[in-house]
Structures are given as structure tokens and as C-alpha cells.
């Protein structure tokens, strides 16, 4: 479902039964439902805003999950010779594997893009994601990316995916280079 005034605001909602790929065959994930709603506001170029809620209920590879994910993202699009920024705050509340679940994730980034050869963008960023403090406490605090990508700010992390957005505090500096429309590099 999608309702919008193009270029000004948009509201999207969905309700799905996730599938998993096993040996090239898509199979429904038993007893799992995933839903959400997102509002995007594009009225002010200096402050673009996304507000969202995602819910999940069911059993998957990571165990029983029944919680809501609430988030807000505010950003300014990257443009040559301008400062841009990107901030996101996310909270999760509910239950996971029959334990109370409360987790959170924060992302802050500020950057500047130069014109000319390779269009370099220099940025400073910081990610923080909660983790479970005491596994015997009966409480879950590990942030769950739901069905999100691993790449994000930690760069491509290969097939084995050693990095997840949980239990991390990660400051960083990054340079993005755009060699062509098809190729981007980041250091």
C-alpha cells in the first residue's frame, strides 16, 4: 500500500509472510508474519525525515521473535560542495526467545562532497547498537536487524558476514570515490 503527494510526502504499509531460499527454492518461513508502516517527509531539503514502525511475530533462524521496531531517520541528501548528514535512532520492544526484549541502534554521520575528479566524499560516522549485557538475566538486549543487509557502514563483509549491528560501538572516518556511474569505492 502506497499513498503519496509525490516529492512532498509518502506513506507506505505492508504485511508479508517472509520466505527463505533453500537450494534455490523459496519456502515460506513457518508461523512468521512481518509488517510495517513508514512515513517520509520531503518538504524541507535541509531536513528530510523518515518515521517508521516494523513488527515481526514468529519463529525463524534466530529463534522466536515478537517485537516492534520504532525508528526515525533525518538526513540531508549528498550534493557537491555541501555538508550533508544522516542520523537514525531505532528502538525495539517486545519479546525474543521468551525473554523481555529491549534493544536500540544509533547512527550518526556528517560528510562533505567535493566536485571534480572522482567526486570524493569525506565523512565521519558513529554507530552504536545494544547487546545483551548478561545472557543469564532473562532479558534480551541484542539489536536485531530483522531482514536488513549486513553491509551498511561496516563496508562489504563477505559471504560469512562477520559484522552485525549488535553490541557495537563503532566510530569511523570514510572516503567515498565515484569512479563512474557503475563503480563506487570506499576507504
What are these regions (language model features)?
Residues 4-8, 65-109:
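Surface-exposed extracellular loop regions of Gram-negative outer-membrane beta-barrel proteins
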Amino acid at each position: 500500500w502506497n499513498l503519496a503527494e509525490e516529492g512532498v510526502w509518502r506513506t507506505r504499509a505492508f504485511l508479508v509472510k517472509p520466505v527463505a531460499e533453500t537450494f534455490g527454492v523459496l519456502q515460506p518461513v513457518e508461523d512468521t508474519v512481518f509488517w510495517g508502516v513508514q512515513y517520509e517527509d520531503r518538504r524541507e531539503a535541509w531536513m528530510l525525515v523518515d518515521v517508521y514502525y516494523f513488527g515481526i511475530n514468529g519463529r525463524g533462524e534466530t529463534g522466536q521473535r515478537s517485537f516492534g521496531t520504532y525508528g526515525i531517520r533525518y538526513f540531508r541528501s549528498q550534493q557537491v560542495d555541501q555538508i550533508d548528514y544522516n542520523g537514525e535512532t531505532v528502538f525495539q520492544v517486545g519479546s525474543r526467545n521468551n525473554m523481555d526484549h529491549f534493544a536500540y541502534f544509533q547512527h550518526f554521520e556528517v560528510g562533505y562532497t567535493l566536485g571534480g575528479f572522482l567526486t570524493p566524499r569525506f565523512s565521519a560516522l558513529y554507530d552504536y547498537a545494544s547487546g545483551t549485557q548478561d545472557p543469564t538475566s532473562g532479558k534480551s538486549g541484542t539489536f536485531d536487524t530483522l531482514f536488513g543487509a549486513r553491509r551498511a557502514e561496516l563496508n562489504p563483509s563477505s559471504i560469512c558476514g562477520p559484522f552485525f549491528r549488535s553490541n557495537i560501538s563503532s566510530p569511523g572516518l570514510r572516503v567515498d570515490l565515484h569512479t563512474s556511474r557503475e563503480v563506487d569505492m570506499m576507504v
